[in-house]
Curated annotation (Swiss-Prot):
Alphabetically ordered keywords of this record: Cell membrane, Ion channel, Ion transport, Membrane, Metal-binding, Sodium, Transmembrane, Transmembrane helix, Transport
UniProt subcellular location: Cell membrane
Reactions the enzyme catalyzes: fluoride(in) = fluoride(out)
Cytoplasm recorded as keyword: no
InterPro entries: FluC
Protein name per its UniProtKB record: Fluoride-specific ion channel FluC 2
Pfam families registered for this protein in UniProt: CRCB
Record organism: Desulfitobacterium hafniense (strain Y51)
């Protein structure tokens, strides 16, 4: 059990740092491209991991840990609320559509591609 917690912690530490860099580099305009990038790529990678049926150790380190901290639901919701409050309705709809539609599509694509590595 302690080794599982350590794996999740190490992965989470690394994932959070990588997400921080994406946000700092890409979230400079009206549309939060950094958050969009980490959430879409995270959906794809987690789908690929699930499709590949990786070991528990790898899943804890990379899936639960790294990708759990790399992707962000709370920041997404905050940014969506901010777009609405700033009356950026078109950007809100675009951001929401790309995030949810793209996330589901990329998770499915990742799962399908990952299944070739079983």
């Amino acid at each position: 059990m302690a080794s599982h917690i350590l794996l999740v912690g190490i992965g989470g530490f690394c994932g959070a740092i990588v997400r921080y860099f994406f946000s700092r580099k890409l979230n400079s305009g009206k549309l939060p491209v950094g958050t969009l990038t980490v959430n879409l790529s995270g959906a794809f990678l987690l789908g690929a991991m699930a499709g590949a049926n990786l070991s528990t150790t790898t899943t804890l380190l990379l899936g639960t840990g790294f990708l759990g901290a790399f992707t962000t639901f709370s920041t997404l919701k905050l940014e969506m609320a901010q777009l609405q409050l700033k009356k950026e309705h078109r950007l809100f709809i675009l951001y929401t559509t790309i995030t949810y539609g793209g996330g589901i599509a990329l998770a499915y694509l990742g799962y399908w591609l990952g299944s070739f590595f079983r």
